Structures are given as structure tokens and as C-alpha cells.
Amino acid sequence: MPTETNQNTTQYDLFVSCSQGWEGLLQTELEQLAVGDVKPGHAGVYVSATLEQMYKICLWTRLATKVLLPLDSGPIETGDDVHTVASKVDWPSLMKPGASLKVDFIGTNDAVRNTQFGAQRVKDAVVDSIRHAGGERPNVEKMQPDVRIHARLHRDELHISIDLSGDSLHRRGYRQKQGGAPLKENLAAALLLRAGWPTIAEQGGALLDPMCGSGTLLIEGALIAYSIAPGLSRDKFGFECWTGHNADTWAQVVNDAKAIRDKNLQEKSFDIFGYDSDYYVTKAAEMNCEALGLQNVIHIANKPVEELKQPTHKVLVPGLVIVNPPYGERLGEVNELRTTYQILAHQVKQQFEGWTFAVFTSNPELAKETRLRANKKNKFKNGALPAELFVYSVLSADDAKLRKDKLTQAVQTDEDGQVENASGAWVRKNLCDKPLTEAATMVANRIKKNLKRLKKSVKQNDWHGYRVYDADMPEYSAAIDLYNDQVHIQEYAAPKTIDADKAEARFETLKHGAAVALQAPDNKLFVKTRKRNKGKAQYEKQTDTQGFDAERCIQVQEGNAKLWVNLQDYLDTGLFLDHRPLRMRIHKEATGKRFLNLFCYTATASVQAALGGATESVSVDMSNTYLEWADNNFRLNNVHLARHRLVRADCFDWLNKCREGFDLIMLDPPTFSNSKKMSDVLDIQKDQVRLISRCMDILNPGGTLYFSTNFRQFKLDEQISTRYVVENISAATIDEDFKGNPKIHYCWKIQH
């Protein structure tokens, strides 16, 4: 709490939190900000700061996650004690009228057994306090609250604070796009500090990340080098609706930081380069740089690690090569990554003599593949994963040659599919160029046989997406689909009774055979593992990207329609190939009709209906992402959305409220779903009667309902066959590429 009344000189006792183990780094950072009386604590530091100093901490810290102003504390022996302790705080004097709030509750004990209960009791105390004072009841806002209250229950003692930072300070606000496994921004800053980047930058050294992803290390490196306050790109802070906030003082702190940024960007120059083999993430990195106005400061290029070398257009002052390579979760991935680490280290040794080389990895065993001796090691956490930063000094070429390692052996023997070109750079062979084993030859031959069988259908129907293999050989259990010239492999996870190493080896064989048979280079192979999931779990993301991203998609032609397909981020791609015949049937029958698509996914059937001449359509799904995807599918085909609506809703709720009539309905629900977004659990075997019956209630006379399910044990209820005219059209809705898997789905045509 404050110790003086004058706002400009009032000292606030604050707790500035950070990741465990960073306390020393954070203490040094705050002392450099001229914040006095800094004392290290557990996962943070205690400081005494003026209002202006508090603003500077929020704006300038590269390491902290929260800035908390402690308010009160008390013992918790019963659930009601939470309300009692929180009620001791004079909330009306702390929160501006009308401010929304959120309570972050951490910790439990015998009286408070879950954090939701604790948060609710604190919230009740805040609301009661404000209402008793005659104030307006504050709204609870989970995403972007005006005021965040931090409640921590530790050793039966509840500590209440107001969160002056708001959203976690690692969220700088510049991340427009991201790759598959982005580093948190404050973690990237901590890695750079531990690697010695500030000193290297002061000496004019360069910064280079050969596997830069969406550019977090590069951006944080630039912010450090140019002394740019990381908080300048944030839209909102937690203190803005705190009554102690002084807008004039805050504006001055911000303006001072902007002046420093502008001056340094004009007067200083640093060489900062980032490369990545993934074209899409380099575009994401460029967008993130542009968000900060650093597009002319940070240079991004699409380049694999095998081609890593210093820029040829200028001589760089030796600096820092820092990298966060993949660490691998599967045996095959780890084995492949050993080669990646070897190549990375080889290129650094060849090209960056006299530089500092830093490798951050969650698999320290892979770091050994560099065959370098670390000057220092620092332990970190990357999310929940233990990780380590290895910092090396790159020896001269002569010194490096004194140490023989297996890297050289790999180059000479070409056993692992690598070759060394005339310039000494390493080039990794594509999987499709490597010699086939006997087992991989069998797989390749089976796929070639399937391609030959499908050739006529592909040509006649102009297929651009089709299945070429579906666990044809039981020991090689996967589905392989071809989209244009890109290959999508979904491995069916092996039963627990199968030895994991054996299953892994079989899958590597399958992948090799597929790559050769389809002549697909590595950058056109996309591999997923399909596990036994419930409901729409198959739709879950494989990466951390957010929403629909056209740059990560390709266009696939289906009849007259162009459809977006994403091979990278989800287990399924946005286009269920087995439903192709049903979509084409809907296309033919939709002319002049009103079409309803329930559980619409990416609304590909709705696009076909619209292009087939449907007068109107309604597509219903609960997922914002898939409705955004559907919107883009419509726009790709120049379909106006005024008459083709996309509705985000629970399909059961929507059906119960629907008073419209439709001529053509597609019902393709998941087998099971217990999504929190749904009002009830969906089990298609149990719920088929009420779901189909409700659809028939809104089906116009002479209309058709197409009901489809992927549940292999599904049995159509006799009530449906008795009430309506039902025709099993499953066989007619399975094309040649799925004939080997006739139970891929069942489909019925249902009419009055």
C-alpha cells in the first residue's frame, strides 16, 4: 500500500513477478531502470517505487510477467473467509466506476478446493463492496477486463493484490502471426540476456537466428539493441482503470520512451538476420516485424539450415548466432533432428568463426550432436518443459579440425542421406531421393498400384484431392491423401500392444515409400498422427496458430468450386474427401432450393450448393475458426454472403428455435461431443431420433434430408424407418478412392 499522500512521491510496495530462476536477472533489470530498494523473492522481486517508476517497470521490463500492488491478506479456514478477507479492501476507492473486472485466483487448501470457487468468492466481495457504497455493479469480463484482481492462497493465507500490468507483460502486442511452437517474448529476452547479447550489441556485433520461426528472438534482440521499450506496442495496461492512475505522468513516460526509440532507430544500426526453411513462418516473422516498424531493421529470408552462411553483400562484425531448434517428441523425429543439429553446428563452425553460438533446447541430448563444448549452461522452462541454453564460442577452422566427430563420417559415407557440395555446404537429401529398403519398396509399389487403379477416375472427374492409400497393408497403418502435388499422411496410432519402437520404424518405412512413390520432396510431405478421439477432437489444432490463415492453406478444385485446405495445423484438412460424392449430389440438386448445413465444419457442402444454384443457404457450427474458414471458402468462389448465412450456434439449440423451412438439408454430426459450448452431450447413436426428427420438422414437403455418420457401429433406429421414407445410399456416396474402406461413412436419404 502507499506510504505517502502526494501522488508524485508516494512510494508503492510492489511485487514484480517473473519465471522461477530469473529473479537475479529481473533485479538487475529494475536496478538499471533506477528503481531503488529491490529485493529478490520467490518467482519475482519486491520493490518500492513511485508512480512514475511503476509505469516505467510496466513499459520497460523485458522479463517480468506481472506488477502487483498488494492490498490485504488474511487466514483462510473456511470458504467464507475468502469473502471476509477480500471485503477488507476498500474496492470503491480503487476501481473507477463502471470498470469491468476479472479475478485470477491461485492456490487451494482444505477450505478452498478449487480456484473457481475462490475466484467467485473474491468477486462476490468486490461486487458487494461496490454496491454497498452505492456504486454501479461491475461486470465480469474474462478476456479484456479493465481491472484484474490477483488472489493467491498460500499456506492457508490469502493475499489480495490489484494487477497493475493487466494481461501478462510477456504479451508485447506485436505478434500478428506465429509459427508452430513460438517462444514467449520474455523467455526470448531472457535467453538473449544469458547469451550475452547486450554486450555483443554494444560492440557492434551482429545477431542471426538460422531457424527464426515467427521471429521472436530477432525482435526481442532488436528491442534490446535499440533500447526500445517492449511495452510500447501494448494496447492496454491494468492500471488504466485504477483510481491511482495519473494519465499525464503515464503520457510523459510513454513519450520519453518513444523519443528514445525514434532517436536510436535513426542514429544506430545493427545487423540482424533471420532465416527459416518454412516460407509461411518467414512471412509471419515479416508481419511481426512490420507491426513494430522494424521491417527495415530485421532482415528475414526463406532459407534452410543447410544453406546457412554469412551474408555476401557485407562483412559482419562477429556476433551471436542464437537458435531454438525443434526438439522432437517421437523417436523418428529425434533421430532426424540429430542430423539437423549436426548440420547446424557444421555450418556455424564453417561460417561463423569467432562468433558466440547459443542453442536453446528441451532435449539436451540433441545439443550433444553439435560436438561443441559449452562455455556455460542455463536451465529454463519452456512452458511446462524443462529446457536448457547452451552457449558456445566458435573455434577457428584450424582448431575445429583437431576434433574428429561423427559429423564428418556422415558427410563421407552419405549413409544418412547427406552430401557435401563443392563449397563445403551441407545439403540434406529429400526422403524421396534416398534408396528404398525392401519394406519401403513394398509400400511404394502398393501406392503405385493404387495410382494406376485411380488414374481413370482422377482424369474423368478432374480430382485434385483424393486418397491413394488407406491402411492397405495392416502393418503400415495410415491414410495418405494427395492434394494437388502435396501429400498428407495421417498415421493411425498403433495399439498399446505394439512395441513403440517397432511402430515408429514401420511408420518411417511407410513415409519413405510414400515419398518415393509420389515423388514428393520433404517440403510437400505433411505428417499427422490420428488417435482415438471423442467428438470433434479430430478438428483440434496441431500447432498454436490462431484462426484461419490463408497463407498456411492451399486451394483445391472440386468440380466448379475452389476450396481452402490446410495441411499443416489440424489433423483434418478442412475438406472431408470421402464426402465428395455427397457434395456433388447436393450441387446438382440445390438449384432453386433453400439449403441447410448442420455441423457444417468449413461449409464445403454449402459452397457446392450455392454454386449449384441454391437460392439461400444456412450453415451452422459452433466453431469460430471453421466459420471464418467457411466465410473464406464462400469469398474464394465469389459467393455473396447476404443469401448464404453462417451461424455460430449449438445445432440442437438452433434447431429447437428454428421456424424456417428448407428444401435440402445435410446433417453430418460428430459421433460424440461433450463440448462446453454445447448445452448437452451429443451421442449420435442415442440422439439420432430427436436430431433427425427435428430436421424433418423443418424439411419442406418434397424436400430431402441427407444424414451421414462416420460411426462404424451405427445402427439406424427403426423409428426413423417407420416414420419416413428412408433409402440407404452409402455405397453410392463412396468414390473409387474409398472403395477399399466401405465403412468410412454411412449415408441415408430421408424424405416425408
From Swiss-Prot:
Pfam families: Methyltrans_SAM, RlmL_1st, THUMP, UPF0020. It catalyses: guanosine(2445) in 23S rRNA + S-adenosyl-L-methionine = N(2)-methylguanosine(2445) in 23S rRNA + S-adenosyl-L-homocysteine + H(+); guanosine(2069) in 23S rRNA + S-adenosyl-L-methionine = N(2)-methylguanosine(2069) in 23S rRNA + S-adenosyl-L-homocysteine + H(+). Keywords: Cytoplasm, Methyltransferase, RNA-binding, rRNA processing, S-adenosyl-L-methionine, Transferase. GO terms for molecular function: 23S rRNA (guanine(2445)-N(2))-methyltransferase activity; RNA binding; rRNA (guanine-N7-)-methyltransferase activity. InterPro entries: 23SrRNA_methyltr_KL, RlmKL-like_Mtase, RlmKL-like_Mtase_CS, RlmL_1st, SAM-dep_methyl-trfase, SAM-dependent_MTases_sf, THUMP_dom. Residues 53-164 form the THUMP domain. It is an enzyme of class 2 (transferase). This is Ribosomal RNA large subunit methyltransferase K/L. It comes from Saccharophagus degradans (strain 2-40 / ATCC 43961 / DSM 17024). The gene is rlmL.
